[in-house]
Curated annotation (Swiss-Prot):
UniProt source species: Plasmodium falciparum (isolate 3D7)
Biological processes per GO annotation: cell redox homeostasis; response to oxidative stress
Subunit (UniProt): Homodimer.
Protein name per Swiss-Prot or TrEMBL: Glutathione reductase
The reaction(s) this protein catalyses: 2 glutathione + NADP(+) = glutathione disulfide + NADPH + H(+)
């Protein structure tokens, strides 16, 4: 009798638990569809946060979540969508478009591998699916903050003092649609600025007729696009645009694109772009963007050249820190061209205020870098050059993994008393062009300038990747892979590694570890390569300079 009672009790209890979980699941799914809508928090009475983070991009999110996991009381303020530039208008949508362009290349050339492929492309469908994925990431970011017990405030922040900020534009859940926007004042022992950056528009006549790289992702139809700028964002976008069937022009102010990258690598890229009918206009000093009619723009250069009939003109001439509304001047926070100046601990000129990510620049310490390694070649020459440098030198690395690393390590230092800092040297970089570029360390030109030509040895190779070997086209039209090692001193310390070609974006990551561990050419020579791969060429290179 009692056994039956216990059985019924446990049965109904189990049924209740399962039912509750199912209901919660449906509630979550229902709520999840609206997670992109704002969720507002009312400040808790007398709350003093251990850390207030201004900005919900990669660096801000990383710092906030890590600090919360260290049991700190954390608030995060964001005026737009969570995820920052990277998730919303940068790395993520860009890589999806890069993937689409790569799929195009494979489909277009599949006949060389025996496939009879006919295809069409639906840009609006790709945009829809891409944006759904980004919205999903926005929602995941919001869930992660909730899971880590980070209080999220949505609005625009500005400083009232070194410990207090004003948030404009927040609403609580009981006043979401009616009444004036609330203002909230938060107090924190430490404040982190991670506001990222925004596109720059120069004072050019007709600039209002253009869009930025951010708005590029809103384009669903176009026949002809011009991009003004020659940095990595411009180069990545123009390569995508052409492969999506759009007539493409890129306008470079100087004699070549990507001037800060190794010249030999960029020469290979420019040749590939020209073979794919991407128009590279050099020495292009734009003086006017004229609107002839709707979706009919012309680009006018200072030397009289005119390029016509563009549906869209995209300006990619740089980005600037999004700091002007923070009221930094009230606290005398040191800035340099609007970038917040921080030390190697990410601390600003105000003791309890920090900055990470694209909005800041890190002042290098004064000690001689790599002094033990410099003895491999000509230390005296290098020291003399250093003595002639009187101005401050800064790191300004605008990359998502750098911001994430800096944010997490800052939280560790603040709340676990750890000492590790972000290492801004030898940061691997990839340009998602077609073909992609991977690079670590110094270019050949920079190495010669620092160490002297007599102390630099170059190893390089150019070849046709096996993937393209079966293409039924002229050999000179087949895509090439080019790679280079920049070595310094008698022990041939590798100070730079560069590659352009198929899968370069994946190849370069592992070599970054080797360079960080001070690998030499001998280390590469003594490593057994994997065959047949493009990466094996790094381990079998022969010098052109004896």
């Amino acid at each position: 009798m009692y056994k039956h009672r216990y059985f019924h009790f446990f049965f109904f209890f189990f049924f209740f638990l399962v039912s509750t979980k199912i209901i919660r699941s449906f509630t979550f799914l229902n709520n999840n569809t609206n997670l992109s809508n704002p969720v507002y928090f009312k400040k808790k009475a007398n709350m003093v946060y251990d850390l207030i983070v201004i900005g919900g991009g990669s660096g801000g999110m990383a710092a906030a979540r890590r600090a919360a996991r260290h049991n700190a009381k954390v608030a995060l303020v964001e005026k737009s969508r969570l995820g920052g530039t990277c998730v919303n208008v940068g790395c993520v949508p860009k890589k999806i478009m890069f993937n689409a362009a790569s799929v195009h290349d494979i489909l277009e050339n599949s006949r060389h591998y025996g496939f009879d492929t006919k295809f069409s492309f639906n840009l609006p469908l790709l945009v829809e699916r891409r944006d759904k994925y980004i919205q999903r990431l926005n929602n995941i970011y919001r869930q992660n903050l909730s899971k880590d017990k980070v209080d999220l405030y949505e609005g625009t922040a500005s400083f009232l003092s070194e410990n207090r900020i004003l948030i404009k534009g927040t609403k609580d859940n009981n006043n979401k649609d009616n009444g004036p926007l609330n203002e909230e004042i938060l107090e924190g022992r430490n404040i982190l600025i991670a506001v990222g950056n925004k596109p720059v528009f120069p004072p050019v006549k007709g600039i209002e007729n253009t869009i930025s790289s951010d708005e590029f992702f809103n384009i669903k139809e176009s026949k002809k696009i011009g991009i003004v700028g020659s940095g990595y964002i411009a180069v990545e976008l123009i390569n995508v645009i052409k492969r999506l069937g759009i007539d493409s022009y890129i306008f470079a102010r100087g004699n070549r694109i990507l001037r800060k990258f190794d010249e030999s690598v960029i020469n290979v890229l420019e040749n590939d772009m020209k073979k794919n009918n991407i128009n590279i206009v050099t020495f292009a000093d734009v003086v006017e963007i004229k609107k002839v009619s709707d979706k009919n723009l012309s680009i006018h250069l200072s030397d009289g050249r005119i390029y016509e009939h563009f549906d869209h003109v995209i300006y990619c001439v740089g980005r600037s820190p999004d700091t002007e509304n923070l009221n930094l001047e009230k606290l005398n926070v040191e800035t340099n061209n609007n970038y917040i100046v921080v030390d190697e601990n990410q601390r600003t000129s105000v003791n309890n205020i920090y900055a990470v990510g694209d909005c800041c620049m890190v002042k290098k310490s004064k000690e001689i870098e790599d002094l033990n390694l410099l003895k491999l070649y000509n230390e005296e020459t290098y020291l003399n050059k250093k003595e002639n440098v009187t101005e401050d030198i800064f790191y300004n690395v605008q990359l998502t993994p750098v911001a994430i690393n800096a944010g997490r390590l800052l939280a560790d230092r603040l709340f676990l008393k750890k000492t590790r800092k972000t290492n801004y040297k030898l940061i691997p970089t990839v340009i998602f062009s077609h073909p992609p570029i991977g690079t670590i360390g110094l270019s050949e030109e920079a190495a010669i300038q620092i160490y002297g030509k007599e102390n630099v040895k170059i190893y390089e190779s150019k070849f046709t990747n096996l993937f393209f070997s079966v293409y039924d086209i002229e050999p000179e039209l087949k895509e090439k892979t080019y790679l280079k090692l920049v070595c310094v001193g008698k022990d041939e310390l590798i100070k730079g590694l560069h590659i352009i070609g198929l899968n370069a974006d994946e190849i370069v990551q592992g070599f970054a570890v080797a360079l960080k561990m001070n690998a030499t050419k001998k280390d590469f020579d003594e490593t057994i390569p994997i065959h047949p791969t493009a990466a094996e060429e790094f381990l079998t290179l022969q010098p052109w300079m004896k």
